[in-house]
């Protein structure tokens, strides 16, 4: 702008002196004394002379149009763009300056900058975040949205996106066309899903992938959708969900979901739902790995048996005694990892199998647990602690 002020006056004087001769009419009277017609005079003017004069005029006017607004107006524009985007003030001002203080253009520029920054940060570890749960009559969906810090996980924009994604996850279709059960899905299936957002900072129709990128730009962190699960029930059943460390309904750091199936048309759904809610809470606290001891994987069984046998052999007892020790400890192992064998956290005098049997008697119809799911934010992701030593956390 210093250059503009330096050159504006001499160029303006030149432009004024040339253009005023024509606009005042004096030049035309001089022309009339030398040429019979104005067209003869125009034909005598060197090629490009008129366009040169006109170009100088446009050049001068461009300086006045690019002049920045007053300081008070600048602050108002910065405030408006900051409220619209929640971007850092330095980025807001940089975009406004780049776009000659055009608010709409600066908002588009911020989005472009944000996508570039989000791309650069995508390799950083994102082990914090939130689980979001949505439920309708026949399904429960849970998604995990990750970020780098707990500070961002508590942000209302981040939480709004997580809840919106969970609601849309109810539309995911199982590739196996299964009627009931647990269906896991990842980014490759969900990222191109359409989202219709209605938030002051993120709104309009977009995709899951673009919405995550936009929120990452606003937050200034790596934000990513990691995984999702969909649990469906049969027609005669109940789905119950529990969220631990929940900042608001539908959000939490640990989720437990249980599916109960009842035979026949049972009208005592309230009792079934009560036990279902208690079981979902139990799943979060007790961390079962398998539904029943019959469903413990052969690999897990073999590994545990080998460990228990090695421990028993160190006692120096005979082979028959060792086998009894191993079998006794295996029963303890089942009580730890199999849901139906676990002690009920609300009443440890009974196990889950007894709890469900008592429920069947109460409602007058056989009830069984068909599926359960436990999900925790960041499980299985290597985290860098203060010591910079990676620690693997596996479910």
Curated annotation (Swiss-Prot):
User: Does the keyword Transit peptide feature in the UniProt annotation?
Assistant: yes
Its GO CC terms are:
mitochondrion
- Sorted UniProt keywords: Elongation factor, Mitochondrion, Protein biosynthesis, Transit peptide
The Gene Ontology terms for molecular function here are: translation elongation factor activity
Which Pfam family, any one, appears in the UniProt record? EF_TS
In terms of one coarse class, where is the protein primarily found?
mitochondrion
Q: Which domain of life is it from?
A: Eukaryota
Task: Mark out the transit peptide.
Answer: 1-63
Transferase is among the record's keywords: no
Location(s) in or outside the cell: Mitochondrion
PROSITE patterns this protein is in?
EF_TS_2
Protein family according to the UniProt entry: Belongs to the EF-Ts family.
Q: Which HAMAP family does the record associate with it?
A: EF_Ts
Q: What does this protein do?
A: Associates with the EF-Tu.GDP complex and induces the exchange of GDP to GTP. It remains bound to the aminoacyl-tRNA.EF-Tu.GTP complex up to the GTP hydrolysis stage on the ribosome.
Which protein is depicted? Elongation factor Ts, mitochondrial
């Amino acid at each position: 702008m210093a250059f503009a002020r330096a050159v504006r006056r001499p160029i303006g004087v030149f432009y004024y002196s040339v253009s005023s001769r024509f606009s005042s009419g004096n030049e035309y009277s001089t022309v009339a004394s030398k040429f019979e017609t104005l067209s003869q005079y125009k034909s005598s003017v060197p090629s490009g002379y008129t366009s040169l004069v006109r170009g100088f005029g446009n050049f001068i006017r461009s300086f006045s149009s690019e002049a920045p607004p007053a300081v008070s107006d600048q602050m108002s524009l910065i405030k408006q763009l900051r409220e619209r985007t929640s971007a850092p003030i330095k980025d807001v001002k940089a975009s406004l300056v780049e776009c000659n203080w055009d608010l709409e253009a600066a908002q588009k520029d911020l989005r472009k900058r944000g996508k570039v920054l989000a791309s650069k940060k995508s390799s950083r570890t994102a082990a914090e975040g939130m689980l979001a749960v949505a439920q309708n009559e026949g399904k429960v969906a849970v998604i995990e949205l990750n970020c780098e810090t707990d500070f961002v996980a508590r942000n209302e924009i981040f939480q709004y996106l997580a809840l919106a994604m969970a609601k849309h996850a109810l539309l995911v279709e199982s590739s196996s066309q299964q009627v009931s059960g647990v269906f896991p899905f990842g980014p490759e299936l969900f990222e191109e899903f359409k989202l219709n957002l209605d938030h002051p900072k993120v709104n309009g129709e977009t995709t899951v992938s673009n919405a995550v990128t936009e929120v990452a730009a606003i937050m200034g962190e790596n934000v990513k959708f990691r995984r999702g699960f969909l649990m469906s029930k049969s027609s005669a059943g109940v789905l119950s969900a529990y969220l631990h460390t929940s900042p608001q309904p539908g959000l939490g750091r640990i989720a437990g979901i249980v599916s109960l199936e009842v035979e026949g048309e049972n009208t005592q759904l309230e009792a079934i739902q009560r036990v279902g809610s208690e079981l979902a809470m139990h799943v979060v606290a007790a961390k079962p790995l398998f539904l029943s001891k019959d469903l413990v994987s052969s690999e897990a069984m073999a590994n545990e048996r080998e460990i228990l046998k090695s421990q028993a052999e160190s006692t120096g007892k005979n082979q028959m005694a060792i086998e009894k020790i191993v079998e006794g400890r295996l029963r303890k192992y089942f009580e730890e990892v199999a849901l139906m064998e676990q002690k009920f956290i609300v009443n440890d005098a009974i196990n889950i199998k007894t709890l469900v049997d008592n429920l069947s008697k109460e409602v007058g119809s056989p009830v069984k647990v068909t599926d359960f799911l436990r999900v925790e934010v960041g499980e299985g992701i290597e985290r860098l602690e203060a010591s910079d030593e990676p620690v693997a956390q596996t479910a």
